[in-house]
Curated annotation (Swiss-Prot):
Binds DNA as homodimer. Interacts with protein E1; this interaction greatly increases E1 DNA-binding activity. Interacts with protein L1; this interaction enhances E2-dependent replication and transcription activation. Interacts with protein L2; this interaction inhibits E2 transcriptional activity but not DNA replication function E2. Interacts with protein E7; this interaction inhibits E7 oncogenic activity. Interacts with host TAF1; this interaction modulates E2-dependent transcriptional regulation. Interacts with host BRD4; this interaction mediates E2 transcriptional activation function. Residues 311-398 are annotated as: DNA-binding domain. Phosphorylated. This is Regulatory protein E2. It holds the Pfam family PPV_E2_C.
Length: 398
């Protein structure tokens, strides 16, 4: 009994010294786990001999002592092999070598520089969960060697790539089954928002299918006030967007001036879908493997003249009223600097004053085409919502 008490006191005294030192040397953390390993062995032996306590120290059950000893041995051996690798010279903290982080997903590997990723389910702000994404993950291969990989975030979940294979340690689809109803979610990683991949369609009859691989370019003609040509390109440019579309929320800048439309034209002549003589944007089904990034360099509309009356660029979005309401809420919260106004949900009625209550329309107003192009470059239109760009002249009275 006395010998066990002396050994336990020696282990705990050394542990206190290591805690006070708070070293960033991996060798010190190996000594720390060696002491914990010895402490678990002493307590296990004391319980095996029938002692309920050693001095003022209560001896846990055999199962608890055995589990602590196994954990200490496992981490101690892992740290010793890590010390022999090229990462042994890196600074390490007690927290980064703790058993809590060792058992945190991804389990049984070391992790550094964690950050919080927020996932909002069903488009409801009060239905959000937080997950930890790791910047660097240290994986031990089957051969026993250590490799350092970077952690990634996509719409599908949190993952890292080792030996050209994606390894997910958090699957958002499984989380959506637990916390959501509609199987829809969006990921907020810092100032980056990743939404579910979905096709974008317009009210025109022309369809353009975009391939799912490679870098593709979709050329479109857009009506503007300058006799130029518009080119819209959609590229696979980000590895993390293979399971979703990411966009960054840009810094707010001062709005540009309004522009003027041709005299004598009615508002309906400025809506692309109602004027067959004006080229329209073909709808494009965006493959989940593509990240939509539009860059406008030219545009064409030689039929428009310059005149004193104002024409405000707009985008009409048509779809389920609830989806439009959620989209309007997200736009006001994250992208309010990318447009001037957004309407409430409105409907088109037939001659008999009936209307289709299953679909609604919202109209987004912009200062000019430049701000509208910035909006298109930044915001991903959700699934099931049709879009149509145009101009409205009555906004000068608002």
């Amino acid at each position: 009994m006395e010998r066990l008490a002396k050994r336990l006191d020696a282990c705990q005294e050394q542990l206190l010294e290591l805690y006070e030192e708070n070293s960033r040397d991996l060798q010190k953390h190996i000594e720390h786990w060696k002491c914990l390993r010895m402490e678990a062995v002493v307590l296990y032996k004391a319980r095996e001999m029938g002692f309920a306590n050693i001095g003022h120290q209560i001896v846990p059950t055999l199962e608890t002592c055995r589990a602590k000893a196994h954990m200490a041995i496992e981490i101690h051996l892992a740290l010793e092999t890590l010390l022999q690798s090229s990462y042994g010279k890196e600074p390490w903290t007690l927290q980064e070598t703790s058993n809590e982080l060792w058992l945190t997903n991804p389990k049984k590997c070391f992790k550094k520089q964690g950050r919080t990723v927020e996932v909002i389910f069903d488009g409801k702000q009060d239905n959000a969960m937080h997950y930890t994404a790791w910047t660097y993950i240290y994986i031990q291969t089957v051969q026993g060697t250590w490799c350092k990989v970077q952690g990634h975030v996509c719409h599908a979940g949190l993952y890292y790539i080792v030996e050209n294979m994606k390894q997910f340690y958090c699957n958002f689809k499984e989380e959506a089954k637990k916390y959501g109803v509609t199987d829809q979610w969006e990921v907020h990683d810092g100032n980056q928002v990743i939404v579910s991949p979905a096709p974008i369609s317009s009210t025109t009859s022309t369809d353009a299918e975009i391939p799912s691989t490679g870098s593709t370019k979709l050329v479109q003609q857009v009506c503007t006030t300058n006799p130029l040509h518009t080119t819209t390109s959609i590229d696979n440019h980000h590895a993390d967007c293979t399971d979703g579309t990411a966009y960054n929320v840009p810094i707010q800048t001062s709005p540009p001036r309004k522009r003027y439309r041709q005299c004598g034209q009615s508002p309906s002549q400025h809506l692309q879908h109602s004027n067959p003589s004006i080229p329209s944007i073909p709808s494009a089904s965006v493959d989940p493997g593509l990240c939509g990034v539009r860059t406008n360099s030219e545009n064409c509309n030689k039929r428009r003249n310059h005149c004193g009356s104002q024409a405000t660029p707009v985008i009409h979005l048509q779809g389920d009223p609830n989806c439009l309401k959620c989209l309007r809420f997200r736009l006001k919260r994250n992208c309010s600097h990318l447009f001037t106004q957004v309407s409430s949900t409105w409907h088109l009625t037939e001659n008999d004053c009936t209307r289709d209550t299953k679909t609604g329309i919202i109209t987004i107003h912009y200062y000019d085409e430049a701000q509208r192009n910035l909006f298109l470059n930044t915001v991903k239109i959700p699934s099931g919502i049709k879009s149509c760009i145009g101009y409205m002249s009555m906004l000068q009275f608002i």
